[in-house]
């Protein structure tokens, strides 16, 4: 986000990623909404429950855990412990197979949390969560999604995503 394209800022002044500009000029600025649009995905009750908890509970504590200096009177250990409650529940839920789309929606946030203090994360007794995270990290899909691209400029060749490389 250090070198945001001018066109991106024109269509989405908030300047955060992701941004999807549709042919009709509509702009979609939320990851989940982009996933729903591209995959024609209507959330079921279970998916809604987990995504709501992720967005309204876990991400709140994740931000304060990772960036305590951005907030007043925040104890990052307390925030980590509050986020842990969600992860405890997710670990239990993961004893069943997590639907792929839901997994893809939750994974980036759990990855951020894990990477903030990997030694602490790995020391937790989350057998299912650790296996799920590790499986995602070594997947071909993750490798394709994390491929680095040069910043696109008007006139450049169109990049089709995801690549099949």
Indicate residue ranges for each PLM-predicted region:
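Residues lining hydrophobic/aromatic ligand-binding pockets adjacent to catalytic sites
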Residues: 72-78, 119-124, 137
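C-terminal end-helix/capping segment
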Residues: 125-142
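GST superfamily/GST-like fold recognition
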Residues: 98-125, 130
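Short, hydrophobic secondary-structure boundary micro-motifs
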Residues: 62, 122, 143-147
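Surface-exposed helix-capping loop/turn segments at secondary-structure junctions
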Residues: 92-99, 141-146
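Hydrophobic/aromatic-lined pockets within catalytic cores
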Residues: 39-43, 70, 95, 109-110, ...
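GST-like domain detector, emphasizing the conserved glutathione-binding G-site
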Residues: 1-85, 91, 98
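Acidic/histidine-enriched, glycine/proline-rich intrinsically disordered or flexible terminal extensions
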Residues: 149-165
């Amino acid at each position: 986000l250090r070198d945001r394209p001018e066109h991106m800022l024109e269509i989405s002044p908030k300047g955060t990623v992701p941004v999807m500009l549709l042919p009709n000029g509509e702009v979609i600025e939320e990851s989940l909404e982009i996933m729903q649009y591209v995959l024609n995905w209507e959330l079921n009750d279970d998916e809604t429950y987990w995504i709501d908890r992720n967005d309204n509970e876990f991400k709140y504590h994740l931000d304060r855990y990772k960036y305590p200096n951005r907030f007043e009177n925040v104890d990052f250990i307390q925030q980590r412990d509050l986020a842990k409650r969600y992860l405890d529940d997710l670990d239990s839920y993961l004893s069943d197979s997590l639907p792929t789309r839901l997994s893809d929606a939750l994974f980036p946030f759990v990855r951020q949390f894990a990477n903030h203090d990997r030694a602490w994360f790995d020391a937790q007794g989350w057998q299912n969560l650790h296996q799920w995270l590790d499986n995602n990290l070594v997947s071909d899909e993750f490798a394709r999604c994390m491929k680095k691209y040069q910043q696109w400029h008007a006139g450049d060749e169109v990049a089709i995503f995801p690549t099949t490389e």
